[in-house]
Amino acid sequence: MTRRSLICAALCASTPLLRAAFADDPPTQWQQWQRRYVSSGRVVDAQQRGISHSEGQGYGLLLAQAHGDREAFDEIDAWTRQHLAIRDDRLMAWKWQPGAGNNIPDWHNATDGDLFRAWALLRAGRDSGWTEYTYAALRIARDIARLCLAPDPRAANGPLLLPGAEARRAKKRVLINPSYIMPRALRELGEAAGEPALVQAADHGETVLAELAATGFLPNWVDVTRAGFAKPVEHDFRWGYDALRIPLYLTWSNRTDHPAVRSAASHMSDGALPGHVVVEATPQGEVLQASDRAGFTAIRRLID
């Protein structure tokens, strides 16, 4: 399983709407997922040379909380704190690799991983009664607000969620990953932590996603400039494994009628082979990859 499909599979097992897309019993799914991908609290990405990453740890925490598995939640949290929470702030290094002298080859964070970790910790305290996790959730949320937001070059009062604390930003041009915008998590964390900027980032993020949908293309990465959207300098400009999460997060945030959900449905057209959906394409509509993996087809069924 690749890094992105691991994320997709985790999310597809974690929401009531997406559980309905599967025939198996959800608790059995969780146990199978845990046995396959979790080792002593480490969520393993087997097809990426066994690395672990902050997104996987965040989703693992969210799954464990959603299924009421306190033991697994504690183990995933403990591993995360010991191995990824190594920065001077409350954010995580995004990647851990086994069998290396330096297990952390890149100390930069990935904001979506921090967002989901904080949200899982918040839910653990608020919804599961594991209240000792609440304080950590609020501290992470405050550092996301402090370090991972930047003004939209077109509207200074519209905060953009950055892909990382050290991500490229300037007054005239800001790099974003639209799939990092998870409105529900941003709003709940902002309200709990007393950080209105996170709530504003959710609101403005939905506006940005609607603007992207109006262009007819939802990219993995895009630059926001004073003149509008532009191809990013560092990344390919395409619909792909990152952007697949946009409709998932909007649906999870009760925004099923959002224009980006409708746009994503048009992107996820049928592939050339039966049962396959398009998961990677260019702005011109050239299909680069299609897949029949359960997570991707579940998203397609969800938004159709």
Kindly label every feature range from the protein language model.
Residues S5-A23:
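N-terminal export signals
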Residues D24, T28, G50-S54, H108-D112, ...:
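Extended ligand-binding clefts on enzyme/binding-domain cores
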Residues P27-T111:
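N-terminal carbohydrate-binding/catalytic regions of secreted carbohydrate-active enzymes
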Residues W33, H67, T80-H83, R87, ...:
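Alpha-helical solenoid scaffolds that mediate protein-protein interactions
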Residues Y59, A72, F116, A136, ...:
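Charged catalytic carboxylate motif
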Residues L61-A66, F116-R126, R184-E191, L248-W252:
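Short glycine/serine- and small hydrophobic-enriched flexible loop segments
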Residues L91-D143:
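Substrate-binding cleft of extracellular glycoside hydrolase catalytic domains
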